[in-house]
Amino acid sequence: IRDCLLSRGLGDVYKRQDLDKTMTEEANKIVADLDGLADRRSIVLYNEDWHKGVIGIVASRLTEIYYRPAVVLTRTDDMATGSARSVSGFDVYKAIEYCRDLLENFGGHTYAAGLSMKVENVPAFIERFEEFVSQNILPEQTCAVIDINAEIDFRDITPKFFSDLKKFNPFGPDNAKPIFCTHNVYDY
């Protein structure tokens, strides 16, 4: 029984990973085809076929790739439901709160939120959300910041180094992956 449950659990993980990959690829294609993306300070995407359980992950990926607040919406029954993610220093909750008259429900915090609205309110939400973000985001908040933990010599990057680094797993919010930099490296 235990092996069967474990196998089923792994199947769910793989299914979620496939959904994540497929939806992220679809979202990136939509973003690439958007007119005027360079002039927008936010990304809001709606696709009624996307899986509700993965939209938060996709919103996070869009924020990482394009470094803008992102909202990803899908259809749940007769409502558009979604997840929002933000960039460092920008309060996405306030941006969503600014649109509250268009929403049925919302909640969250500075960097992540959930929301629901009538499907017919999605176009107005996209414009209102963009309005707030454009008026309130600072230029430096739209550029990715890479915090380097340490400089290391290239010759110190060895299999033993990676083996030692693995001992610090698991990485996550309270134990971030370290970021190192080295100099004078060329890609031929």
Stretches with model-predicted labels:
Residues 18-45, 98-188:
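Mid-to-C-terminal polyanion-binding domains and interfaces
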Residues 2-121:
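Hydrophobic helix-and-loop "lid/oligomerization" segment in the mid-to-C-terminal part
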